[in-house]
Design a protein with these regions (language model features):
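Outer-membrane beta-barrel proteins
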Residues: 2-7, 40, 51-55, 89-94, ...
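Repeated loop/turn-to-beta-strand initiation elements of outer-membrane beta-barrel proteins
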Residues: 37-41, 77-81, 113-118, 144-149
Length: 179
């Protein structure tokens, strides 16, 4: 996880928020099995004493994460992806035990000799944490340049994982150069 934890510190002149990257340990395993044009895969991870953001810093909780996914490629032109996920946070000091679960999906297609990819992808929390839907278009101009555009819609209550972004629906345009 590359996201910092924000910690409130008294530096003598008042409170100051600083970003910290606390260390953590993770154990996990994954599998994948292909069946012709489809793949079934799964992952499970255990993160003991994982850092969890709190009101004035971070605290620690054991975190279990699991994913079970299915990919289907139709003639190398159309792509379907569906995943079920779940996270269980056990007994943190501030928030207690929590459980999140849901599904992610992508439906896309390629055209113009695979240079253009269009589709829709998203995330739905069945535990009531909101939804994210993205409609996108990606175009590979050549081996170095790639352009993409899309729109993202967020839903959910203000106090939910995705709902806190509800007022942040946005349109994007990206141009990338790889060398």
């Amino acid at each position: 996880v590359d996201n910092p934890m924000f910690v409130s510190r008294n530096n003598g002149g008042g409170m100051r928020w600083t970003a910290e990257y606390p260390r953590f340990t993770a154990f996990g395993t994954s599998f994948a099995k292909g069946f012709g044009s489809q793949t079934v895969r799964g992952e499970v991870a255990y993160k003991p004493r994982f850092p969890v953001q709190g009101s004035f810093g971070f605290h620690r909780a054991d975190l279990w994460q699991g994913v079970l996914g299915w990919d289907y490629d139709i003639d190398s032109k159309y792509y379907l992806n569906f995943q079920l996920f779940g996270d269980v946070q056990e007994g943190s000091e501030a928030s207690g035990s929590r459980t999140w679960h849901g599904a992610t999906y992508e439906i896309s297609g390629k055209w113009f000799r695979d240079a253009l990819k269009t589709g829709v992808r998203g995330k739905l929390y069945t535990s009531g944490e909101g939804t994210l839907t993205e409609v996108f278009l990606e175009y590979e101009l050549d081996d170095h340049w790639k352009a993409s555009t899309g729109v993202m819609f967020w839903t959910g209550g203000e106090d939910t994982i995705l709902g806190e972004y509800t007022d942040n629906d946005f349109v994007y345009l990206t141009l990338r150069y790889a060398f």
